[in-house]
Amino acid sequence: MASFDFVKAYQWNYRPQIPKRPAWFTEWPGGNRIAVTFTIMHEWESKPGWATMRRFPMPPNSYHTDDFLGLGAREYGANFGIWRLLDVVDKHGVKATVISSGLTAELFPDTVREARERGHEVASHHWNQTLQPPSYNTKEEEREAILKSIAAIEKATGERPLGYMSPGPRPSPFTLELCAELGFIWNGDYSDSDIPYTINVNGTKVVSVGYVRPAYTDNDIMELGLSGGLQQLKDEFDAHYEEAQRHPMKFRYSMHNFTGGRPGLAKVFDNFIDYVKGHSGVWFCRCVDMANFWLEHEGR
């Protein structure tokens, strides 16, 4: 069985014990060879936030710490970028996973509500991007933030999210336990495997559906320019597709509403979907679809 024990693998001295490919895993649903998942990061952060730290710190003698350029980017993502990305996947008839901060769902409930109405999955991305789980002192502090995110998404969409990804993604030693306790069936934090796998968290199974960086997010390709970024995505997909002829593979591309949602990178995404659709044996799926497929074979 392609699962492993949470206590052994996820401890302070993290040493992965990722299982080998299970014998039953010979194909994806429909006999497909490669699963392709698109995730849209629908993020928000409170001041001063990561936006400040990513560019440069505010002057130490500044009378305020508001990074209006960085915070404005988040406004752009929620008001324009998310809609552009949803329109791209809808154009191609592909369903995506929107990974939303709870605060985004609270401030812009129409975005996650309509995403769900269009058939896309809405997963939790913690409460906001400013506070990473490792910054919490206790498991209960992290639990409270995740519960706030769940409540905001459920209020906006009418459904409780089934997937979770930490900001960063930088989970804490408590994160997987909280995912299991709070009813999440998948987690997207770990970039340690080419395929999904189940994690046995104190008797509850959580499916890991992470991705391996670099080159799998808009942040990884944006410095290459639009044509260079598209070529990088094609090259990465080609490598996965070639290997998928020997054994099933997964490919996940992730976009942020405030970067990948800009016209240029959104067009790169549009063209990339066209390219992928030109290949046979491709299963376009949401993260929850992949997790459910895995649990159907591994047991819940």
Where are each of the predicted segments found?
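Positively charged, amphipathic and often flexible ligand-engagement surfaces
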Residues: V209-G228, Q232
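Catalytic alpha-helical scaffold of carbohydrate-active enzymes acting on polysaccharides/glycoconjugates
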Residues: A2-G163, G168-V207, L230-Y253, G260-R300
